[in-house]
Amino acid sequence: GDVYKRQDMRYPEIAELTCMSLFQYLPYASEKAFEWMADDREYFQLCGFMLMARLLMKGNQLTERSEAEFLDQAMATLQSEGVLPRKAAATALKKFAVQSKENGKKVNRLLAPLAKSDKVEIASLAGEIKLETEYWH
């Protein structure tokens, strides 16, 4: 996975397609998702959150420890400057939140302060995630 990202991950569309059609099938996909989400490089974070979103869409469940790590990374990324990782983190949070009512409540509790953010793009993303969560529950 790292080899692909070092070479041609200059466009978000390529990153998305690669996550959806290749990375999700790796036996170590979950480990890579966490590694990439924690990376400081924009396209690594983008791939990490996209991959996590895909794994969650497939029904993968997180352990208590991995859930805490995921939520921590996603919330930090939502407040970061990188637009692409921020949107990918929001997508992954949506997929996590709609897995169960309990997950939805956890995410909405974490998002409550962000919904009141002075930064319009952050407040908007928080509202978008909340709406999608409420729609599915």
Model-identified regions with their sequence ranges:
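Short, small-residue-biased leader/transition segments that mark boundaries at the very start
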Residues: 1-4
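Amphipathic alpha-helical segments within well-ordered protein domains
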Residues: 6, 20, 33-34, 75, ...
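Alpha-helical scaffold repeats of the Armadillo/HEAT/TPR superfamily
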Residues: 7, 65-73, 106-117
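Short coil turns that connect the paired helices of HEAT/ARM alpha-solenoid repeats
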Residues: 7-10, 38-42, 76-84, 113-121
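Histidine/lysine/aspartate-rich catalytic loop segments that bind and position anionic ligands
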Residues: 14-15, 24-76
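Structural detector for internal amphipathic alpha-helices that build alpha-solenoid repeat scaffolds
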Residues: 14-25, 46-60, 87-99, 124-132
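Short conserved catalytic/interaction loops centered on acidic-Pro-aromatic/His motifs
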Residues: 60-67, 83-88, 99-108
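Eukaryotic acidic, Ser/Thr-rich intrinsically disordered low-complexity regions
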Residues: 100-137
